[in-house]
């Protein structure tokens, strides 16, 4: 249903906003092209244990593998690649592989995101503003990544680098009071 800009849509936003602790958790990326490459930095920044499965990879993904930042299996996706995985991101050019990987992840209770296909997503990547411990996430529920990025840029201006120092100071004050 398409609604007017006034917000008369009856569609409910049932997404649950959450920040996950991924440190040490196993995350799998199926595919190693540009779309997959874009998802890697956020997982690495979260201290996740990242594995990539794909027959070929972009030079950047190959570099991360060489540097020991992630594990790259040079092969096609198989269902056993999901063994022990907490979260999966699927970013191949094959709709059949994307669908199969999502369905297998769903059967195993693994959170999964198929890049650029809202119908096969348990979660969406938000646009994020980071200022030290402050993180502001913006989601359009997969409707418009461009709008989310524009809002991120506006918030980055509104919440400049000085917020990092302020928040660290507030954290120190809070700790001294507890």
Residue spans for each PLM region:
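Residue-level detector of alpha-helix initiation sites
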Residues: 33-35, 95-96, 142
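Hydrophobic, well-ordered beta-alpha structural blocks that scaffold small-molecule cofactor pockets
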Residues: 1-56, 61-64
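Structural motif
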Residues: 26, 86-87
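An accessory alpha-helical subdomain
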Residues: 142-178
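Glycine-rich, highly charged phosphate/nucleotide-binding loops
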Residues: 65-83
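Hydrophobic beta-strand scaffold residues
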Residues: 50, 72, 111-112
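ADP-ribose/adenylate-binding Rossmann-like module
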Residues: 87-94, 98-125
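Short loop/edge segments at beta-strand edges and connector loops
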Residues: 54, 72-76, 116
């Amino acid at each position: 249903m398409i609604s007017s800009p006034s917000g008369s849509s009856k569609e409910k936003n049932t997404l649950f906003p959450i920040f996950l602790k991924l440190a040490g958790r196993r995350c799998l990326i199926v595919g190693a092209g540009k779309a997959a490459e874009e998802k890697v930095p956020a997982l690495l920044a979260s201290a996740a244990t990242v594995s990539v499965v794909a027959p070929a990879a972009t030079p950047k993904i190959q570099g991360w593998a060489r540097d020991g930042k992630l594990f790259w299996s040079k092969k096609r996706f198989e269902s056993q690649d999901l063994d022990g995985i907490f979260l999966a991101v699927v970013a191949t050019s094959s709709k059949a592989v994307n669908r199969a990987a999502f369905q297998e992840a769903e059967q195993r209770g693994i959170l999964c995101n198929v890049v650029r296909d809202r119908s096969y997503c348990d979660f969406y990547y938000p646009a994020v503003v980071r200022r030290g411990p402050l993180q502001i996430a913006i989601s359009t529920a997969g409707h418009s990544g461009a709008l989310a990025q524009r809002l991120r840029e506006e918030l980055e201006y509104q919440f400049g680098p000085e917020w990092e120092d302020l928040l660290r100071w507030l954290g120190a004050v809070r700790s001294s009071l507890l």
